[in-house]
Every structure is written in structure tokens, then in C-alpha cells.
């Protein structure tokens, strides 16, 4: 479900019951079907579909979140996270991710290089350490120790964009 549709439906669902109340009120059936997965942007819809597939098979919400986030992390066309993601000023793709379960346990990684699925590393941090967040070299060392593969995440397209940026970055931005 797209975010705008969800908000419109939810807002109507909140207002409508108050308009229908009378002296002989009867329970109003909740029309919201659960579970639901929403995205802010259209490029998030493939992640929603993957997450919903997990939920429809009675998988956990935590599994659905991880599987859903892995979709854009693996999509070089997304360029928001993961493989083919935006580079830093030195041409490195550095990634962050965090995840939380229904009990309030959390795991996160930041400034993680060369690991395609930081969401899965963040989950490992949550489930297998006493830490909430690992950063940089420590996060990468942890990921490699837990079987994650080192990969070059800078695609040709992203590298070409970085080279173009590098040529004129002082003129067009605040670096």
C-alpha cells in the first residue's frame, strides 16, 4: 500500500466512526486488513511485496522487515542503499542500517563498507551481541566473522557519477 493511500484510508477510518455514532450504537467493524506494509516512495514497492510474502506465510514481522530491506540493498538501480548506493567523497559506498524487534531490542551498523546487506548485519548485532551499534571497521570485522561476504558495492554507474562529482564538487556543493 502506498503511504498516501494508507494515510487517507486511516484518516477516513478515524473520522467516520464519530460521524456514525447514534443513541443505539452498534460496534463498527474494523475494515483495515492486517498485516499491511507501506512505502513512502514507489521504488519501495518491491520491498513491500517481498515483506508481505513473508507475512502471508505466517513469518514474523522481523523477518519481513529484513527481507524487505534486502530488496533495495541488492538493487543497483535504487542507488539509495546497498549495491550501487551513493558514494562518499572518497568514492566509497558506506552503509547504515538498524532494526528493532517487538520487545524493544535493537541492532544497528553504521559506516559499514563492502557488505551488501547491512540490515542483516544489524540483526546479527541485535541477536548475538550485547551491543546496540557497531561502526566502521568494527562493524565490518563483525560482519566478516559472521559469514557475510566482502563485495565492491560501487557499480560502474555510481563510479562514473562519483568521478563527475569529483571533477567539479567544489563549485556545486559545500564540500
Question: Which residues are covered by each model-predicted region?
Answer:
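Hydrophobic h-region of N-terminal signal peptides that target proteins for export
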Residues: 14-22
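Bimodal feature
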Residues: 2, 23-27
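N-terminal secretory signal peptides and thylakoid transit peptides that target proteins
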Residues: 1-14
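Alpha/propeptide regions of enzymes that mature by internal proteolysis
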Residues: 10-11, 26-175
Amino acid at each position: 500500500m502506498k503511504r498516501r493511500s494508507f494515510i487517507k484510508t486511516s484518516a477516513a477510518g478515524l473520522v467516520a466512526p464519530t460521524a456514525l455514532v447514534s443513541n443505539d450504537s452498534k460496534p463498527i467493524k474494523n475494515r483495515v486488513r492486517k498485516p499491511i506494509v507501506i512505502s513512502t516512495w514507489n521504488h519501495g514497492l518491491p520491498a513491500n511485496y517481498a515483506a508481505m510474502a513473508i507475512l502471508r506465510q505466517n513469518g514474523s514481522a522481523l523477518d519481513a522487515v529484513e527481507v524487505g530491506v534486502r530488496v533495495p540493498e541488492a538493487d543497483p538501480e535504487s542507488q539509495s542503499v546497498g549495491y550501487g548506493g551513493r558514494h562518499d567523497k572518497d568514492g566509497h559506498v558506506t552503509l547504515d542500517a538498524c532494526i528493532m524487534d517487538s520487545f524493544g531490542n535493537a541492532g544497528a551498523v553504521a559506516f559499514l563498507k563492502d557488505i551488501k546487506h547491512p540490515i542483516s548485519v544489524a540483526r546479527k548485532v541485535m541477536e548475538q551481541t550485547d551491543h546496540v551499534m557497531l561502526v566502521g571497521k568494527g562493524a565490518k570485522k563483525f560482519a566478516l566473522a559472521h559469514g557475510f561476504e566482502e563485495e565492491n558495492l560501487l557499480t560502474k554507474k555510481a563510479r562514473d557519477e562519483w568521478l563527475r562529482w569529483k571533477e567539479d564538487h567544489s563549485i556545486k556543493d559545500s564540500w
